Amino acid sequence: MRAIISLFLISAMVFSMIQAVPEEKGLQLSEDERGGCLPHNRFCNALSGPRCCSRLKCKELSIWDSRCLG
């Protein structure tokens, strides 16, 4: 009986994870909306990852300083 209940709970969790994936794709924000674009001072924002707005590459100069370089 416990095995059946465990199997049911595991399959319900897997199903809920599969259902959540398509919804997340629709919730992705552009770099401007999430604050990842800082073209005026050419600094990389931590939220934008290794990308910069003007298609420059983000170079980490130190732990506290990352700049967008060509």
From Swiss-Prot:
Keyword list, A-Z: Amidation, Disulfide bond, Knottin, Neurotoxin, Secreted, Signal, Toxin
Tissue specificity field: Expressed by the venom gland.
Paired cysteines (S-S): C37-C53, C44-C58, C52-C68
One GO molecular-function entry: toxin activity
One CC-aspect GO term: extracellular region
Signal found in the keyword field: yes
Signal peptide feature range: 1-20
Residues recorded as bearing Leucine amide in the entry: L69
Subcellular location(s) per record: Secreted
Domain of life: Eukaryota
Main location: secreted
Prosegment location in residue numbers: 21-34
Family: Belongs to the neurotoxin 01 (U2-agtx) family.
Notes on the domains: The presence of a 'disulfide through disulfide knot' structurally defines this protein as a knottin.
Its job: Insect active toxin causing rapid but reversible paralysis in crickets. No activity shown in mammals. Does not show effect on mammalian voltage-gated calcium channels.
Protein name listed in UniProt: U2-agatoxin-Ao1f
Native source organism of the sequence: Agelena orientalis
